[in-house]
Amino acid sequence: MLENKLGITDSAELARIEEKISKQKAVEMFENGYLESLEAGTYESLAMIHKYLFDEIYDFAGEIRKVNISKVNFRFAPLMYLDAALQSIDKMPQSTFDEIVEKYVEMNVAHPFREGNGRSTRIWLDLMLKKEIGYVVDWSKVDKEDYLLAMERSPIKDIEIKFLLKNALTDNVNDREIYMKGIDHSYYYEGYYVYKTEEL
């Protein structure tokens, strides 16, 4: 159970409130042009996305985590190497689809935040794709289990995640419906599906 600004002590309630507020913020940053104002592909822009999404809920929004974290069979970058990893990721090229996905995979391994990494990093990925090559991922075309498996394997073999994402690319980069559905699917991958973004 994470400490939060709202004083919520029930984990199920926190999950619901976190989903609702951060989805509202995701819509807001799309509609008010905030996303467009960010530089694509930097840790700083990812931290700003994370802070925008979660600042009403967590004190650590936009801040580098202070603990080591892992998920099931996956250990993320150890704390002692995290700063160096983020500096290295910032320097990675991002001019082609393959380079952008490779950068995304490395940022996922870094997992710089205590919570909310996947949701903020997928928005960050789309910002890179949009600004660099004129595409975004239509996440509604990316199966949850296929995606999670591909991401789990991606540090060793990234061909699967590249294949999945390439097949879901669209040049409708400013389409509100694609963005809204994308947020819903992105949250669904993490187990959040109480609210539909378009209804908030």
Say what each PLM segment does:
Residues 1-200:
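FIC/Doc superfamily catalytic core
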